[in-house]
Amino acid sequence: MLSRMKFDIDDIVTKKLDALPKTIWTSKTTRFLDPAIGGGQYVRAIEQRLRDAGHSTANIRSRVFGYEQSSLYIRFAVNKYNLVGQYVEMPYDEFFELDTTNMKKFDVVVGNPPYQTHTDNNSRAIWPAFVQKAVELATPDGYVALIHPSGWRNVRGKYDIIKDLYTTKTLNYLSIHNVQDGRKTFGASTRYDVCIAQNTDSTSKHRTAVRFEDNVTQQVNLKKLPFIPNCNLKDVMKVVAKVGEVPVEVLHSESAYVPRAKWVSKIKSNNPLIYGVRTLSKHSEPVLLWSSRNDRGHFGIPKLIWSESGDILSAGSIVDAEGKYGLTQFAYAIVDTPKNLPLIKKAFDSKEFRNIMLGCTAGTMIINHKIIATFRKDFWKDFV
């Protein structure tokens, strides 16, 4: 979650509001909602713009709304900025369950809602629920303009519902920001996306203005991409398998040789020594576990192995031409012929390939096996 009590109007707020149609400020009826007002940055800026456009206090009060689960936040923001809109205390989970069937919808739903919530030493992502509810609360043709994490841009996974939403609705603008931007803007070591979508069905040819993290802006048809990289779109898409091309075979399992399994141990035993790669050091030295079973896959398969240890630039790799290693859930492998594996390793360890993977990270700084699985089988030829 980004800063919830930051009271200056950030440049990012100004830019996001600037990207909305100018007519929403001159209109006397446009309705606004911030689903989690926090310190009031957005509603403050909205009220000020409406006031600058000549609207009365009564008019502004009738159409600027906000929710926040902390009454302290609401009182502080209202008193500090003399806010006149209608701001209601509501727990996030209650907001997510709002029955919007008979609710009057909003022309603009905008804000920077919290990323996650913490309960009983556990945390869960709540930003997807904010995105879904924001679209539900927007009028037909209305706008949803939110800041949230970048996980939805990854290959198919737990945020598919957000990816499907943004590619079926009209996503007009996407601004991708790296960890350095997160520290600078919010004082948080997290990457984030700024998304501005219109609540209309997108056409098959719709192109989104994507501002990549290297400040390059391109018009992109997101429907044609298996994932959305952070930068270097042209170079990344060169190695992605096209229709009809054979993709890379990636080997991975969350359960075959997990360290907690009864047949896996850190201690050598009288059983045949069957290796399970747990992690690799930056010098490509395997940290091994021992398994009393070899019937759960991986063994006997020639492959190039890497793991989650180290970041994208420092992670090691090893050639397992004989297929003597199994993989824990922390390790991954590219399957190929023993002849090709040394060349694949050369490509995999190259600076050029690692830079491609840097451009594909959606969260943690590890080499993303889901992304590699979208590459064409002979991708390595581009790097050797």
Language-model-derived ranges and their functions:
Residues 1-28, 42:
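S-adenosyl-L-methionine
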Residues 3, 104, 180-384:
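C-terminal substrate-recognition regions of SAM-dependent nucleic acid methyltransferases
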Residues 6-12, 36-44, 50-51, 55-63, ...:
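Signature of N6-adenine DNA methyltransferases within the class I
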Residues 16, 72-74, 313-314:
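Eukaryotic short linear interaction motifs
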Residues 25-27, 57-59, 101-104, 296-300:
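Flexible, charged surface loops at secondary-structure boundaries
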Residues 28-38:
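Conserved class I S-adenosyl-L-methionine
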Residues 30, 107, 303:
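Conserved acidic residues
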